[in-house]
Design a protein with these regions (language model features):
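Intrinsically disordered, low-complexity polar/charged tails and linkers
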Residues: 1-159, 165-186
């Protein structure tokens, strides 16, 4: 019997600070930043607590990664705003956060024969010489909701990584669908 076990390990969000940000000034003043505009137009800011990183662009757009829940996301955005206040940039809006991707890891509670799954499941990629996991793209059609697309990495020991969802609820819907599909293969 399968035992469902999964937890969120990373949330990627986007947001906007609602104004242009002087990245050169941030990079020159704040020690927890990296900025090399010849290589990439965004500034990287690393936040110690919660342990997250964000890309900040001149336009004020932000992409934040590393948070494990929405509370950590909000705390990270607040830390960025505090950092900006240190260089006399006042953010007057409450930034609206949009989840772009959630990564979750866990286990299905049983060993998996990846060779069999690669042959019997649709939308799989399995190249054991290059990577020990099987990539499985799944479409879930919850009643009354739009189609949910998720991608799983499946490992022979039953461990899984799920990506492509936008809520914890979707993670669980995708995992339930995965387990149903795995049961059909046996």
């Amino acid at each position: 019997m399968t035992k469902k076990d999964i937890r969120v390990v990373n949330i990627v969000v986007s947001s906007s600070l609602g104004q242009d940000i002087p990245l050169e000034k941030m990079a020159a003043t704040l020690s927890n930043t990296e900025y090399n505009p010849e290589q990439f137009p965004g500034l990287v800011i690393r936040i110690k607590e919660p342990k997250t990183s964000a890309l900040i662009f001149n336009s004020g757009k932000i992409v934040c990664t590393g948070a494990r829940d929405l509370d950590e996301v909000q705390r990270s955005i607040k830390q960025i705003i505090k950092s900006l206040e240190k260089i006399n940039i006042k953010i007057t809006i409450e930034p609206k956060v949009t989840i772009q991707n959630i990564v979750a890891s866990g286990a299905v509670g049983m060993d998996l024969n990846l060779n069999v799954l690669a042959m019997k499941l649709q939308n799989t990629e399995y190249e054991p010489e290059q990577f020990p996991g099987l990539v499985y793209k799944i479409n879930v059609e919850p009643k009354g909701e739009k189609v949910l697309k998720a991608t799983f990495l499946l490992f022979s020991n039953g461990k899984v990584v799920c990506t492509g969802t936008k809520s914890e609820h979707q993670v669980h819907q995708a995992l339930d669908a995965l387990i149903e599909n795995l049961k059909k293969v046996k």
